């Protein structure tokens, strides 16, 4: 997609919020509506060409007594997901009665397969339907998202002569657009934690290069597992997947890549899973898990070949103590953070309660492979405090000692802090 078309699309989506939500929602709440509708319309546009075939197959399968329809109809749709309702968003645009529109829109949402329901539920969009309907904004919102001047499909819109009228929105550009819209909402509302789930594309590319280029000659025709324990919208996993496949092709190798991530924020988790689904990666979408990596590790005892991450920093992790059912960090017994080292069976890697980033690093180290030639590579973004915080014998000091004594650190690279959005404008960052 050329830059002009991309910019027009971004501006149009941003304008939908101002056109549809003014006087109904505060500016800070626009994202609660626009982001899920953006995702839903993307799914809708991808499924649209096969909609009639799906409806026909649904009738045939139902008549034949088949009750588990999701997988069968997804195959008809040629996607990893499906919508079993009788409607598309374009169909709903013609509704003039608000009550009928509301009823049909709910039925439309309910028609999505279970792997999309997980996403819709985390966006909490159903909680907003009554309000949108009562304010006569639901129909306007749908009308804007199906406007023929924009194309959220993965296929181009053609003129009568077959020439391209509006370019397709490919999966990579869709992911970038997601991030751009999120960033715009954050900046508009002065949200200060944008970097919690928005890592600049240049930094993501750098992280992927550091992960794969130094070992490109060792890449074999085999399966590799990539993990991000603070995956946000899934950008690092996506770019990592692209980079290693590109390098493998250049080396004449055929690789199979499996992606794994964990995220504890509803909205970004929903976006990460949505991004996987629209790429046709249904199984990969199931490997994006919800919950706190610190206290609810969804990949316990698993090992990975590459671990790429930009974990949160400077955010207290007291809620994890509560999740563990304990009151003090000294009571933690998780073997990712309390290890047997240097004749000490309770060697602690646990930092102060106010900053979790070292816990994410310890978590990654616990998932390193030790029985393969390549082993594991960890590329993780930290702020400068990870280099010096904690007195001798403290968790951070112990973790640094362990890393260097075990010869696990290949490089520490300083990166310009102003590449980041508002969360890191005054913080030094480094890539380990």
Task: Describe every region a protein language model picked out.
Residues 1-215, 284-293, 414-418:
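Non-catalytic, mostly N-terminal accessory regions of nucleic-acid modification and defense proteins
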Residues 18-21, 163, 188-194, 224-226, ...:
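Glycine- and acidic
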Residues 30, 34-39, 346-419:
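Conserved Class I SAM-dependent methyltransferase catalytic core
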Residues 196-309, 313-327, 383-385, 392-399, ...:
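Conserved S-adenosyl-L-methionine
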Residues 314-356, 379-390:
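Mobile active-site "lid"/loop adjacent to the S-adenosyl-L-methionine
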Residues 420-427:
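Conserved small/polar residues in nucleotide/adenosyl-binding loops
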Residues 428-432:
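N-terminal low-complexity segments that are often proline-rich with Ser/Thr-Pro
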